Amino acid sequence: MKLTLLLIISFILFSNVVFSQKFNLFNFEQNHCLTTPELFLDECQLLNSTLPMCKGYMRVTYVSSNTYEFSIFNTSTPLCGQVNRKAGSNFTCDQSTNGVKQNYTGFSVTCISTSNESSLSSKTQQSIVFTVLLLSLALIASIF
């Protein structure tokens, strides 16, 4: 009985991780904005990048009334920072830390700061929490 329960939980965990990875890959391989500036621009492709580290995709997340958090995803680690949204639907992105202007599909932002710290996406965080909860349940089930 306990072995069957552990096998079921292991299968659920494995499926969750695989689905999460495929879902993220699907989102970041898009060639266009999946949302509009009014919908907080979930994923957009970077265009006209001149720096190798800036080539990739940007995810923008709502933080407060005029502030959005962003991660630039490339083949290595994402660049993380904060952005301030300006009025209107057309924006320009000025990466002041690098002295380079980057234009993004459908919108742009002012990059306040960037770093090489890796950030976990919300889906990855949800996957980790889900995994920990299931492992806790498995541990409790094995005790009783």
Curated annotation (Swiss-Prot):
Main location: membrane
Keyword Nuclease applies: no
Glycosylation sites: 48, 74, 90, 103, 116
Taxonomic superkingdom: Eukaryota
Topology relative to the membrane: Lipid-anchor; GPI-anchor
Residues linked to a lipid group, GPI-like-anchor amidated serine type: 119
Subcellular location: Cell membrane
Propeptide: 120-144
Signal sequence residues: 1-20
Family: Belongs to the ponticulin family.
Protein name per Swiss-Prot or TrEMBL: Ponticulin-like protein L
